[in-house]
């Protein structure tokens, strides 16, 4: 990994992070759940197409994570994520692994000086540990089988869920 920074005299420690993004919105996901014996679960379903996007990077070694929420999913949003991430970890050299999404490979993508990227092979989400976070959030953090009255309510729940991940480092390792 140090080869990515070859030729640079930089004494900052090196950290490996994996990044991914996911869409959360007002279209709820109906899934299995446990209920008392002899009863039947009742879940409201809504079809409102309003979405937010969560960008998250995770260090599998330490369980550290960094997230932002964006109303769009494009290169501009990815640049904002990278800038905020680089500022938060400015005392480190970062290797950031991600998939081949268009906004990851765009010529308009601006990499901060302390971040180098590695692209994962195509069609291999199993290589990105961040992929599993989205299932965990949807199943354990009140997204499945819940309806949200507004997009702001989705944002509040998503922000709460992402903040809780900071205290759940063992889940992220």
PLM regions: where:
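RNase H-like polynucleotidyl transferase catalytic core
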Residues: 40-48, 113-132
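Short beta-strand segments
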Residues: 17-19, 95-98, 118-121
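Short, solvent-exposed loop/turn segments at secondary-structure junctions
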Residues: 21-25, 60-63, 101-104, 123-125, ...
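Acidic/histidine-rich, metal-coordinating catalytic segments
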Residues: 92-104, 128
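Short, aromatic/basic amphipathic alpha-helical patches
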Residues: 106-114
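C-terminal anion-handling pockets and recognition modules
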Residues: 12-16, 132-173
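Extended, low-complexity cationic-aromatic segments
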Residues: 1-79, 83
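A generic "structured core" feature
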Residues: 5, 18-19, 85-88, 128, ...
């Amino acid at each position: 990994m140090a080869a990515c920074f070859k030729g640079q005299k930089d004494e900052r420690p090196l950290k490996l992070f994996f990044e991914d993004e996911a869409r959360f919105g007002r279209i709820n996901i109906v899934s299995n759940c446990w209920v008392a014996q002899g009863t039947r679960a009742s879940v409201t379903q809504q079809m409102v197409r309003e979405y937010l996007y969560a960008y998250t990077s995770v260090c599998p070694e330490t369980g550290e994570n960094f997230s932002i929420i964006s109303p769009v999913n494009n290169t501009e949003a990815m640049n904002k994520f990278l800038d905020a991430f680089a500022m938060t970890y400015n005392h480190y050299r970062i290797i950031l692994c991600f998939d081949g999404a268009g906004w990851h490979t765009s010529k308009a993508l601006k990499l901060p000086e302390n971040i180098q990227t590695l692209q994962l092979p195509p069609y291999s989400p199993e290589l990105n540990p961040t992929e599993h976070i989205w299932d965990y959030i949807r199943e354990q953090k009140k997204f499945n089988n819940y309806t949200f009255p507004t997009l702001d309510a989705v944002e509040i729940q998503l922000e709460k869920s992402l903040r809780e991940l900071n205290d759940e480092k063992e889940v992220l390792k």
